[in-house]
Regions:
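S-adenosyl-L-methionine-dependent methyltransferase catalytic module, highlighting the catalytic core
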Residues: 88-97, 107-195
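Conserved SAM-binding loop
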Residues: 2-117, 190-195
């Protein structure tokens, strides 16, 4: 199984633990990594991989550039807390690129802030509550984020279905609208299957 973890940071793909297929070759992709093997070298390693044991590689490359240039086809692509940083004018192109690095039946595993849940939290908040400061930090971070890495697109289950299924490349077949990740249960997780 070949897995791509986009915007990986230090997060391990959840789907890696859920798969019964062993061994796997995992490529963690993030521009925050120090020097790493060039994408071409990683592609060569994948081509030579004998599938007898698992292998993990790290790559310092922009997600768009990597997907535009790679010749690899991935069984799984994990996108955890990255998609909301893709601006709306690039979302459909990003999804198109995902379709070019997957084949029929392959899965895209996505975790994004669930803006429907965040909106409800705002509507029901009590500024006099003892936990308001923590509540405010969570909401401000997830809705606005730091200017150096702003959130540039809004995600709800309806929006995810609309954008991923619009061009008939993917079908969302699994949802979790109240998903807990990294200690917070404000996320939307879905699996989009390549069709």
């Amino acid at each position: 199984m070949l897995i791509l973890n986009l915007g990986a940071g230090k997060q391990k793909p959840i789907i890696q633990d859920q798969t019964k297929e062993k061994p796997y070759f995992l490529i963690n992709l993030d521009t925050a990594y120090y020097s790493t093997p060039e994408p071409g070298i990683i592609e060569s390693l994948v081509m030579k991989w004998d599938r007898k044991e698992s292998y993990i590689s790290f790559c310092n490359e922009d997600a768009f550039t990597f997907m535009e240039r790679t010749k690899l086809i991935f069984d799984r692509v994990c996108i955890y807390r990255l998609l909301e940083h893709i601006s709306m004018d690039k979302v459909l192109y990003f999804i198109y690129l995902l379709s070019t690095i997957t084949a029929k039946g392959d899965l895209i595993d996505v975790i994004v802030p669930n803006y429907e849940k965040l909106a409800n939290m705002i509507l029901k908040e009590d500024v006099n509550d003892k936990g308001f400061e923590a509540h405010n930090i969570l909401l401000t971070t997830e809705l606005l984020n730091d200017p150096s890495c702003p959130h540039a697109s809004i995600w709800t289950s309806a929006r995810a279905e609309y954008f991923f299924e619009l061009e008939k490349r993917f079908k969302i077949n699994q949802w979790a609208t109240d998903f807990e990740f990294d200690g917070r249960n404000i996320y939307l997780r879905f699996l989009a299957e390549r069709i």
